[in-house]
Every structure is written in structure tokens, then in C-alpha cells.
Regions:
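Core catalytic lobe of class I
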Residues: 1-288
Length: 288
């Protein structure tokens, strides 16, 4: 990305899901996620997103999906993590107690804000099919965060891309009345429930900040992949057809696939060469 910046490359938006802190070992030197402390992880992430900001258009946005992590909790937990494919697990700093929720998403969000990003919104990714957890002293985790950040105070958002289907409620510009619903403005003949005939009814509304998106496995991927349905509203709201979408943690290539399906271009980075076949398949499928 540093080379792209010196060459004058500019992207309209970045949508990405980086490796989570202490979750798994991808088996590659220089990987992010196995730093010894949360602070080291956050510092590494801030540096990555400085590079992103250098290639981001002045009116561009960053859509960042990030999950949280729990403290080790002792040898038993570390053994379970090792069985899931992790060779090593960062040691917990002294200020974190066993079983503590670390708070990685907000640590990162605040660090990025302190580094100059505008922190515009926290979006809740609600998972209706969360990963089962064998816990009895807390709820099963069924959400992650998507943070919307911008490079500048004013930035591009497509209002239509920020819409979602309206669900229930009263039609637009109506209010409850004793005899039903009254239309608050417009022609007088439309101001009673009997003559309303759905005048002003809204088919869409401004998207809410809780997005329900099921996780979906992808054939050939060893770990969880970024759901296309989570990426799609980000790309539609944050870019125009023909714009370039960046994913610095490309993984299996979901961001590239969704970008191409909606007439955007893409740029991506990925440390693990094992993902190359998956990326090629997804990109080829999007171009058909």
C-alpha cells in the first residue's frame, strides 16, 4: 500500500475484516493477531490503516468489521485454542484478568479516532446463527461490530445505498388518530383514514444500525469468511459504479467478488498464499 500511495493510487472506500486478536495462527511470519499484548495488536492495526488512509480519497470511508476476544483463562482454554489450529496464544497483560472480555473493537475504534480518523458509527452485526459456545455464566456471543470511519468531516455516502426495506409501522407522513390514521400534509381529501389509500407510504427507510446477517461457510475456506450480505450494503453506500474498493486483508476474496458484482473495481492484499485459489474462483465467478 505504501507503493500504491507513492504511485498516486486512490481508492474510494475500504471494507475489511482483519485477523482478530489471539484467535488463530495462520502460520505465516509477520501475521497480525498474535501480538503479545492487545496494545501491540492495536498499534499494528493503526499502522495498517494509516497506509489505507494514504490511498483513500479525501471523501472516502472505511468500513471495519472486528470481533472481540476473551482473556486466556488458563491452560485449559489455551489447550482448546490449540486444538482449533493455534500454535501459540499471546500472553495476557497484567491488567487483564482471566475470563475478561478485552474490548478490542472499541480499543481499536478509539485508537483510530485518536490517529485522525472520524469515527462516524458503530454498526451491530447480529448473527442469527452464532457459533455455539459451551458457557453457562454469560450469554452466547451473537454479534460483532462494523465501524464506519471517514478520512474527512465530509465524505461520500450514496443515500440510496443507505436504504433498507421498510418494515411495518404507519405509512410515511401519517400519525395515529382516534378513528384510525390521519395524513399530516398534502391534499385535504387525503387527510382521513378512509381516503388515505396508502398515500405517502414508504417502501424504504434509512438503514438502521443493527444488521442481521447469517454467517455462511464457503467451500474450500478453512476459517470463517466475510459474508457477502454484510459487505454489500457497505459497498453500495460508500462507492459509485466504477470506483475502487480496497480490502487490505483480502482472505478468500469476498470483498472483491461483491465489488465486481456491483460494477466496482477492487484492490486487495493478502499475506497467506493459500487463499489464492479461492480468490481466483470467486473473482472468476463474479465476472461471469
Amino acid at each position: 500500500m505504501r507503493r500504491w500511495a507513492t504511485e498516486g493510487v486512490r481508492v474510494q472506500m475500504c471494507v475489511t475484516s482483519p485477523p482478530y486478536f489471539g484467535l488463530r495462527d495462520y502460520g505465516h511470519e509477520g501475521q497480525i493477531g498474535l501480538e503479545q499484548t492487545p496494545e501491540d495488536y492495536i498499534a499494528a492495526m493503526v499502522e495498517v490503516f494509516r497506509c489505507v488512509r494514504d490511498v483513500l480519497a479525501d471523501d472516502g470511508t472505511l468500513w471495519l468489521n472486528i470481533g472481540d476476544s476473551y482473556a486466556n483463562g488458563g491452560r485449559k482454554t489455551r489447550d482448546k485454542l490449540a486444538q482449533r489450529g493455534m500454535d501459540t496464544r499471546p500472553a495476557d497483560p497484567v491488567w487483564i484478568k482471566p475470563k475478561d472480555l478485552i474490548g478490542i473493537p472499541w480499543m481499536l475504534a478509539f485508537a483510530l479516532r485518536a490517529d485522525g480518523w472520524y469515527l462516524r458509527q458503530d454498526i451491530i452485526w447480529h448473527k442469527p446463527n452464532p457459533m455455539p459456545e459451551s458457557v453457562r455464566d454469560r450469554c452466547t456471543k451473537a454479534h460483532e461490530y462494523v465501524f464506519l470511519l471517514s478520512k474527512s468531516e465530509r465524505y461520500f455516502i450514496d443515500p440510496e445505498g443507505m436504504q433498507e426495506k421498510a418494515i411495518g409501522g404507519t405509512p410515511g407522513n401519517t400519525k395515529p388518530t382516534k378513528g384510525g390514521r390521519a395524513y399530516e400534509d398534502g391534499a385535504r381529501e387525503h387527510r382521513t383514514a378512509a381516503n388515505l389509500h396508502n398515500v405517502g407510504a414508504r417502501e424504504t427507510r434509512n438503514r438502521r444500525s443493527v444488521w442481521t446477517v447469517a454467517t455462511r461457510p464457503y467451500k474450500g475456506a478453512h476459517f470463517a469468511t466475510f459474508p457477502p450480505a454484510l459487505i454489500e450494503p457497505c459497498i453500495l453506500a460508500g462507492s459509485r459504479p466504477g470506483d475502487i474498493v480496497l480490502d487490505p486483508f483480502m482472505g478468500s476474496g469476498t470483498t472483491a467478488q461483491v465489488a465486481l458484482q456491483h460494477g466496482r473495481q477492487y484492490l486487495g492484499c493478502e499475506l497467506n498464499p493459500n487463499y489464492e485459489t479461492l480468490q481466483t474462483e470467486r473473482i472468476a465467478g463474479a465476472l461471469k
